[in-house]
Amino acid sequence: MARYTDARCRLCRREGTKLYLKGDRCYSPRCAVDRRPAPPGQHTPSRRKVTEFGIQLREKQKVRRIYGVLESQFRNYFHKAERQPGVTGENLLRLLELRLDNVIYRLGLGASRAEARQLVRHGHFKVNGRKVDIPSYQVRVGDVIAVRERSKGLTRIQELLDRASENNPPAWLEYDGERAVARVVALPTRENIDIPVREQLVVELYSR
């Protein structure tokens, strides 16, 4: 599968805001957006006035990059959100939030969504007692997510378990740090999806 392999900090600088793609580094003085807020490039030109289409495109790219999905995947999520009842933009964010890799990140079991995605691919988690190694797997209300027993002895997993025990997950997730088990207790609402995007602009872009 195709994936982005260039420096992730360039993406944040391109969007002009932190997308929190590098985990702990994004909260440190080493963050590229704090050090060099101008767009990437040799001459780092100042940001020019953009058209309405350009604004919508940048917002779509921002959402796509935050969750780490390809354009074709993102378009499929949008069409699925369109078919669901309710507000399309909120439906889109909900579908992205319910990806297994994002849930692992929200639980604190990955320092970034990229790390969470890698851990899922390596088969470190179970959903309802069965190993799931598909990052895009859609969890549902009532699903139980757990770290596999054979993975708990790994140094990095132990570090993340300690991290998760101090993490404050969103209201739609419950986490038992002693057992390293989480449960999806509700569907995420826009109020508890804390990403700095204007999803309505994405809807307007795809509605052109």
Swiss-Prot record:
Sample GO molecular function, one term: rRNA binding
CDD domains found in the cross-reference section: S4
One GO CC term, this protein: small ribosomal subunit
GO biological process, one term: ribosomal small subunit biogenesis
Record keywords, A-Z: Ribonucleoprotein, Ribosomal protein, RNA-binding, rRNA-binding
Domain S4 RNA-binding intervals: 98-161
Xref: InterPro entries: Ribosomal_uS4 (IPR022801), Ribosomal_uS4_bac-type (IPR005709), Ribosomal_uS4_CS (IPR018079), Ribosomal_uS4_N (IPR001912), S4_RNA-bd (IPR002942), S4_RNA-bd_sf (IPR036986)
NCBIfam families given in the database record: PRK05327.1, rpsD_bact
Similarity section: Belongs to the universal ribosomal protein uS4 family.
Subunit structure: Part of the 30S ribosomal subunit. Contacts protein S5. The interaction surface between S4 and S5 is involved in control of translational fidelity.
Protein's job: One of the primary rRNA binding proteins, it binds directly to 16S rRNA where it nucleates assembly of the body of the 30S subunit.
Protein name (record): Small ribosomal subunit protein uS4
Organism, as annotated: Desulforudis audaxviator (strain MP104C)
Organism phylogeny: Bacteria, Bacillati, Bacillota, Clostridia, Thermoanaerobacterales
